[in-house]
Amino acid sequence: MRRAVCPGSFDPIHNGHLEVIARAAGLFDEVIVAVSTNYAKKYRFPLEERIDMARETLASLRGIVVEPVGEGLLAEYCRQRGVSAIVKGLRSSSDFDYELPMATMNRQLSGVETVFLPTEGHYLHLSSTLIKEVFTLGGNVSDYVPRSVLKRLLAGESS
């Protein structure tokens, strides 16, 4: 079985993420969407809610598993789960410049390859950070996030 991992914080998961994950699902037998927590970041949604959003939005895709990734190296996580590839979406050359050193280190540590998928043009500008900022400032993000995510954003606005 060819297994890949798509790691990220997914705060929140958006249509650009979904597009990359769906394409990865066409390339691998199983894709683990590994939802992470970086303690240096401030999150809008707690880990369990980010996992729930990913599961809800990816439920129709075959071969997708959503789970938290614990602390530690992604290379070790891949080795423990028999992952042969890390899949990363690239929006720009700055994404590549950021991701390449990590891809090289992951390959050296565990032998796992990183597969870079260029993001579709209409998603090139999307990031979870930008979506949260636009939403917080009153902008409409409904074209950029799944309906279930939009509902959670709106629900959090009133609490």
UniProtKB/Swiss-Prot annotation:
Chief subcellular location: cytoplasm
GO-annotated molecular function: ATP binding; pantetheine-phosphate adenylyltransferase activity
UniProt keyword terms in alphabetical order: ATP-binding, Coenzyme A biosynthesis, Cytoplasm, Magnesium, Nucleotide-binding, Nucleotidyltransferase, Transferase
Chain residues that bind ATP: S9, F10, H17, G89, L90, R91, E99, Y123, L124, H125, L126, S127, S128, T129
Annotated localization: Cytoplasm
GO cellular component: cytoplasm
Pfam families: CTP_transf_like
Pathway recorded for this protein: Cofactor biosynthesis; coenzyme A biosynthesis; CoA from (R)-pantothenate: step 4/5
SUPFAM superfamilies tied to this protein: Nucleotidylyl transferase
Names of the cofactor(s): Mg(2+)
Example GO biological process: coenzyme A biosynthetic process
EC code(s) of this entry: 2.7.7.3
Site (Transition state stabilizer) residue list: H17
Subunit structure: Homohexamer.
Homology family: Belongs to the bacterial CoaD family.
Role, per record: Reversibly transfers an adenylyl group from ATP to 4'-phosphopantetheine, yielding dephospho-CoA (dPCoA) and pyrophosphate.
Protein's recorded name: Phosphopantetheine adenylyltransferase
